[in-house]
């Protein structure tokens, strides 16, 4: 999340499409949280609907914890309000306009760290969930426990949510955990920054694993059934 991720024309069109889609969902009887994924043509800036997620998603924490949401209310609170039975009247346009103000958008990034080696082993040690700190040499170390990303005080800190723990299998494509930090993870050419690579390498360095046990041959016995 950062205020200049897309130009105002694209942001305005995405809001309009989302508003129309949401109104149609209401007509269909759907209530509560939903998220839309858009595809953007980089040549002409045209946007297309990618998919609708009628649920909380992996990106929900980014928007629910953003500065604009904290200034009013997390999006998930509106989801709960919808099913609470409590009558409410919200000026949606006023809310959207305030949240669209660049001054109310702070910069955060989220990375899902995966195991990318072509092997399978068993994890014996895994980094704790909580706040991690990056040292001057690019290494990272566990600093303190917290479950809220707002506890991250600078770009030299990150919140890590562990997914793969000791005893789990580690294989190519396995999700190791989710890292959230201030600032940007990629540059304008969609390449990981040096800092992002250091975070990924640093977290991975705290995983230890052992090889899979060798398979043992099972002695075959005579069949215990007959076909007559």
Model regions: which residues?
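ATP-dependent carboxylate activation and anion-phosphoryl transfer catalytic cores
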Residues: 1-228
């Amino acid at each position: 999340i950062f205020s200049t991720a897309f130009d105002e024309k694209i942001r305005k069109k995405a809001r309009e499409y989302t508003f129309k889609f949401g109104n149609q969902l209401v007509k269909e009887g759907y209530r509560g949280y939903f998220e839309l994924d858009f595809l953007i043509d980089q040549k002409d800036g045209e946007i297309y609907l990618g998919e609708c997620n009628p649920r909380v998603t992996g990106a929900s924490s980014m928007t629910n914890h953003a500065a604009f949401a904290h200034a009013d209310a997390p999006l998930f609170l509106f989801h709960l309000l919808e099913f609470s039975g409590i009558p409410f009247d919200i000026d949606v346009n006023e809310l959207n306009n305030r949240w669209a103000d660049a001054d109310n958008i702070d910069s955060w990034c989220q990375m899902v760290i995966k195991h990318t080696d072509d092997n399978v082993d068993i994890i014996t040690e895994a980094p704790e969930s909580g706040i991690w700190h990056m040292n001057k040499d690019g290494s990272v170390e566990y600093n303190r426990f917290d479950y809220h990303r707002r506890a991250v005080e600078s770009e030299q800190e990150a919140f890590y949510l562990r997914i793969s723990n000791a005893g789990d299998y580690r294989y190519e494509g396995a999700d190791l955990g989710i890292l959230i930090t201030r600032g940007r993870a990629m540059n304008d050419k969609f390449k990981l920054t040096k800092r992002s690579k250091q975070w990924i390498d640093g977290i991975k360095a705290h995983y230890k694993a052992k090889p899979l046990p060798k398979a043992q041959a099972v002695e075959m016995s005579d069949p215990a059934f007959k076909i007559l």
